[in-house]
Curated annotation (Swiss-Prot):
Alphabetical keyword list: GTP-binding, Nucleotide-binding, Repeat, Ribosome biogenesis
Gene behind this protein: der
Lineage of the species this protein comes from: Bacteria, Fusobacteriati, Fusobacteriota, Fusobacteriia, Fusobacteriales
Any one GO MF annotation of this record: GTP binding
Top-rank taxon, per record: Bacteria
Protein's job: GTPase that plays an essential role in the late steps of ribosome biogenesis.
Protein name: GTPase Der
Species for this entry: Fusobacterium nucleatum subsp. nucleatum (strain ATCC 25586 / DSM 15643 / BCRC 10681 / CIP 101130 / JCM 8532 / KCTC 2640 / LMG 13131 / VPI 4355)
PANTHER family with a match to the protein in the record: GTPASE DER (PTHR43834:SF6)
Amino acid sequence: MKPIIAIVGRPNVGKSTLFNNLVGDKIAIVDDLPGVTRDRLYRDTEWSGSEFVIVDTGGLEPRNNDFLMAKIKEQAEVAMNEADVILFVVDGKSGLNPLDEEIAYILRKKNKPVILCVNKIDNFFEQQDDVYDFYGLGFEYLVPISGEHKVNLGDMLDIVVDIIGKMDFPEEDEEVLKLAVIGKPNAGKSSLVNKLSGEERTIVSDIAGTTRDAIDTLIEYKDNKYMIIDTAGIRRKSKVEESLEYYSVLRALKAIKRADVCILMLDAKEGLTEQDKRIAGIAAEELKPIIIVMNKWDLVENKNNATMKKIKEELYAELPFLSYAPIEFVSALTGQRTTNLLEIADRIYEEYTKRISTGLLNTILKDAVLMNNPPTRKGRVIKINYATQVSVAPPKFVLFCNYPELIHFSYARYIENKFREAFGFDGSPIMISFENKSSD
């Protein structure tokens, strides 16, 4: 699991500008998935050989003072619990603000490394008096920066790397299948975990997670071990709805990155929501195998097999980027079909780590091309020579051809469908890329 670095601070201190300059050109999503929201709040980045995740807590706009104070407190609390290092951004031009002091008070209550970033300091010698005001907040690390003009960002990142280099990040047990139970508040995640770790299965141990309110539960079922990562304790929606739902997204991200398989919990009574789509999009972008679970199926009235079919069609239409994911209808409360999820997780993880021989792969590719040649583009005839699988988890295939830049995404999707028809890969994302054929 990569360390998480959270940027916090009151509105208009330059958090998002700092975020954008820290991640650089990675802000542009090159290989975007159809239907996945583009406005992500986080990026993987690297500095001096260390990899970590930068999280922006921007997007909090005040409506009134009570609302603003409540949201800032909530933001700082979440950053404390979720992040490994906190970048606390203040505005050096406007000076120390009572809201800065409120955030500082909250951040000091927990033993998390905080780097105080005094922003909008383009010239330290001319603005040093502006910086000195902030030493009274009492943090060990203080760096004057300019997020907009990239002043001192390297020094700030050096401190980040030094801090995380001294941290102990435990190795995950490779023998245990790690299942992330993700979803919005009240979808039944904790109920599912409790049911799976009930009397019929043996709880081996409870391990406190890296956050205050996440619990990893190690269970055994049919001689197999599973580590269930539950994002328990996600805050209920605030009185004022927030479109970005930052808090659920950050916790889901941490769980997804650790997981071998993701279980996306949906509320069958409520149906698919924008927050569900956002969390599903993260799992898809992280290229994890996923099971879509319609929970609270026992509460749906007047249902039959046709109801299931209709809901599946609607879900796949709303989540086209998860067309490969199996959909299960369960009741975490009664236990209906819950153990099916463990067996499905085993099955789709096998698909996720499956390797296809080059000979068999090219037999299927040849048949697919004979059935449907790549369309001629710009007067050029595209010839696909051969394919090979270059990796697993997720399965990645490279197809060599003469004009890879002319391959349309619809033809790549056609090849993916043919590979799925032949080899399965149920529940698993697969990656297909086209490259120039080698000179020999």
